Regions:
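Helicase motor core with emphasis on the C-terminal RecA-like subdomain
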Residues: 1-218
Length: 220
């Protein structure tokens, strides 16, 4: 939160602050988005205001860190169950990813889904491969022009049957209820990230499938 924003807020009567994706305060506040650290000033500027943080992925340590960084030590914590019984989880050792992803996508030609990749180049390569197989795949990564990312995101949100092939740059704030599958072509950065990313599937309560491909490292 910038000084300009804080100055503007200081002249406004505010009863409540709602912070979505609150885990970012802990995950990104130190290096990637230092502005998150500034959120601690809210409780000092508005000591009587309610500060509410919402996240789908915060373990006990993360929750405590969020409270600490918000300087909100008298907080009440509400935790809902993490079980998503409508999600089917599959984990496979990566062998031939092209063959494995095509098997996973069988009978999903008109369904919306997300495939997560580690690199920007991989999103382009996987999209090109799937388009040649008659799927409607579009890439999404931070290296694209903002207008391209916006256009691709709007296509995904407004049309059915689109496969978004993306880095983790895609997903924050995305709420499309009928995503039927999420695949990872590599291991996510953490269990929390994995849970959040597959959690974008099946939000309508109907069955959805996930696939995680991993490489086995042999140490000699």
């Amino acid at each position: 939160m910038s000084e300009k924003t804080l100055n503007e807020l200081s002249n406004t009567d505010i009863a409540m602050f709602a912070i979505d994706e609150a885990h970012c305060i802990s995950k990104w506040g130190v290096s990637f988005r230092p502005q998150y650290e500034e959120l601690s000033k809210l409780s000092k500027i508005y000591p009587d205001a309610v500060i509410a943080g919402f996240t789908a992925t915060a373990d006990k340590d993360t929750r405590e860190d969020i409270i600490h960084k918000l300087s909100n030590y008298n907080s009440k914590i509400f935790v809902q169950g993490f079980d998503r019984p409508n999600l089917s989880l599959a984990v496979e050792q990566k062998d031939d990813w092209k063959k494995q992803i095509l098997i996973f996508l069988e009978n999903k030609i008109n369904e919306s889904g997300i495939i997560y990749c580690l690199s920007r180049k991989q999103t382009e390569d996987v999209s090109e491969f799937l388009n040649k197989k008659n799927y409607r795949a579009i890439p999404y990564h931070a290296g694209q022009e903002s207008s391209v990312r916006k256009n691709n995101q709007e296509k995904f949100m407004n049309q059915n049957g689109i496969i978004m092939v993306a880095t983790i740059a895609f997903g924050m704030g995305i709420d499309k209820s009928n995503i039927r599958f999420v695949a990872h072509l590599s291991l996510p950065s953490s269990i929390e990230s994995y849970y959040q990313e597959i959690g974008r599937a099946g939000r309508d309560g109907n069955p959805a499938e996930t696939l995680l491909l991993y490489l086995s490292l042999i140490h000699i």
